[in-house]
Structure formats: C-alpha cells, structure tokens
C-alpha cells in the first residue's frame, strides 16, 4: 500500500457516513437499484449490463443505475463507456489527490436507491467514498475485513474464494467474482428483507 492509499484510507475512515435510516428491501420489491463496480474490460462491462437487464426484465426493477470507476485518466478511458445522468463512469482524473471523487458522481450519490450493491470483492477507495456518501436505503456488499461497517448487509465471501487467497489468475479471479455476485443476488432476491 503506497502513501497516497494510506492517506486515502485515513480520510475515508474519518469521513462521516451520510445520516440515513437504513430500510431493508428484497430485489423483488425494489424500485431502484444502484450498482458500483471497477471497470475491467468490455466483456466485464457486458456482464454488468446483463445484470442490469436481468434486474429490469426478470425482477421488475424500474430504475437500475450503474456507476463504474475506471483506474485510468480520462484520455485513456475505453470508448465503450458513456457518461450519463445518474450513472456511467468516473476515472482517475475525477479524483482529488487522496482518491476522493469530485463532481461527476454527485447525482448518483444523491439518488435514493432502494438498494445499492457494491460488486467488488476487494475495497476500491474511490467506490468506498461513494458508498459511504450515498443516500441509498440499503447498502449491500461482500464481507471486507478493513471495512466491516460499510454495508447494511454483508454477504460472506465464499469458502472457495477464501481458500484460494492471492494465488489466482485472471480467469479464477473472474469465476470467484461471478460466484460471489450470484450469491449476493440470490440472497437479496430470496431473503425476506423488510
């Protein structure tokens, strides 16, 4: 961990979470869902779009917003990404010097999502700032030891992911991500959350 990341984590730990009253909701009853994720490649982007389509078409969620962080400067962002109202993406050039997003994400933060889902297994500081600042009624994400209080519902990491640890290649990493994401969506769809 470099010094900028340490300072960013320190600032994040001192950032006061937005005052809100958490309210549970299952995906079957949700009207609006926000998805936070780290952009990887075009195939991953299509996977996320497929998740959003499933939420709309299969579960009847009326408003699905996706927000990704691209770990590049604006001039190097992939061509398939589009900035749009209430979603889209932000990149390194949209962060201040210690990693906090500025400007571009404000409308997403202010959206009153029924459920905000962090799709990242490992903490991404830029996304953590958005998560902490969000007005979402319920925040869901994977168990992260460094950030145990960030979510209203923590979905435990699968035993396979824990046993594999850091010795994974990109394909194994994606299969672990897919398994965790499926577990997350299965839980918040089937659980009687009220």
Give residue ranges: language-model regions.
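Active-site proximal beta-strand in glycosyltransferases
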Residues: 137-149
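Structural motif
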Residues: 114-117
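Histidine-anchored nucleotide/phosphate-binding helix
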Residues: 41-60
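An aromatic- and histidine-rich active-site surface loop
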Residues: 120-134
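Conserved nucleotide-cofactor-binding alpha/beta core module
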Residues: 56-107
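Short, conserved loop/helix-junction motifs that constitute active-site signature segments
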Residues: 57-59, 109-110, 131-135
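Short N-terminal or domain-adjacent regulatory/targeting segments
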Residues: 1-32, 42
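Active-site-proximal region of nucleotide-activated glycan assembly enzymes
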Residues: 146-194
């Amino acid at each position: 961990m470099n010094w900028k990341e340490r300072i960013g984590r320190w600032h994040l730990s001192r950032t006061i979470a937005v005052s809100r009253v958490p309210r549970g909701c299952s995906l079957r009853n949700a009207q609006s869902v926000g998805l936070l994720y780290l952009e990887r490649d075009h195939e991953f982007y299509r996977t996320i779009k497929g998740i959003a389509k499933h939420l709309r078409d299969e579960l009847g969620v009326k408003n699905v917003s996706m927000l990704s962080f691209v770990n590049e400067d604006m001039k190097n962002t992939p061509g398939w990404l589009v900035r749009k109202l209430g979603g889209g993406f932000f990149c390194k050039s949209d962060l201040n010097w210690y990693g906090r997003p500025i400007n571009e994400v404000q409308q997403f933060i202010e959206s009153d999502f029924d459920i905000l889902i962090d799709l990242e297994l490992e903490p991404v500081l830029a996304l953590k700032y958005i998560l902490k600042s969000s007005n979402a009624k319920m925040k869901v994400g994977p168990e992260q030891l460094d950030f145990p209080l960030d979510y209203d519902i923590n979905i435990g990491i699968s035993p396979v992911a824990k046993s594999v640890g850091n010795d994974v290649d990109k394909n194994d990493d994606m299969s672990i991500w897919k398994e965790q994401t499926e577990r997350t969506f299965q839980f918040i769809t089937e659980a009687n959350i009220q």
